[in-house]
């Protein structure tokens, strides 16, 4: 799942910068973006794959949030590991994210300083980025740079929420209430783009897939029994096709249904993983092993390649971007691995 998710994120964050390519509804829902994609689907052009990954690729983030929730349950509830205090838990998970974040952030800001389109930080914004609370600031889309690094702040928020609430009380109802409550909170501000953006930059927007991950982790044994039944491949195919259909439908239907698309993406990704041929699976798994490095590296490579290819030869630029990102991510992982892992 990590391999598929990071591929979508990496391609999305390049393609949505290109001129004439469809734009996504990620933090807010704007009808004109749907209208634009619908026009393209009715009269497809040679850039159709780019349009699709630009519009849908950002949904790799909910997949990672799902995996974060699942991983927390496996680590802190199923492994028999001694319970850590709130401070130790928070420190450990912050440092775990920071060792990935800091390598990419340093390289990116150094490159950004002498290339066109420099982002000038305020001192308070740098501290917020380093402290992983930048998403709380006003207009986070103008503060967080590179843009994909908003993920670190929302992940840290969800880790803290887990330790304060879900780790202490294991009843599934608490998770469901928070998921529904965060959905209703977003519903209330659907017509207020500025507030909705701030909510979706923070844990309110990430609670749905994260909560699904927690529930999946706690019910993993029952889910495994169901998935191992005979004839499940046909069911898996049906689930994948249904998820794809509903993703398209809910994305276009209304802003209310759009809020549920991350859940459909998670279900569809699980089904897709189960259908990947054995010959292809090792490559997808390999992408997953370097996914953290890809996440912090791809904005650096994008800054280099997107401007020369923003209008013409866009597939050539995309190919160069992908090749360079994979190679540099492999090297970046080696640098990250040299930083000691925090101890719980």
What are these regions (language model features)?
Residues 48-61, 140-154, 189-212, 244-269, ...:
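Interfacial loop-to-helix transition and helix-capping segments at the boundaries
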Residues 7-14, 110, 130-136, 178-191, ...:
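Aromatic-anchored segments of alpha-helical transmembrane domains
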Residues 210, 237-341:
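Alpha-helical transmembrane segments of multi-pass integral membrane proteins
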Residues 70-80, 164-169, 187-188, 212-224, ...:
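Structural signal for the C-terminal ends of transmembrane alpha-helices
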Residues 169-176, 227-237, 282:
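Membrane-interfacial entry segments at the cytosolic side of transmembrane helices
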Residues 82-87, 107-116, 132-143, 189-196, ...:
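Short juxtamembrane and helix-loop transition motifs at transmembrane-helix boundaries
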Residues 157-166, 170-215:
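Loop-centered beta-sheet repeat module
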Residues 1-183, 310-344:
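Membrane-cytosol interface segments of multi-pass membrane proteins
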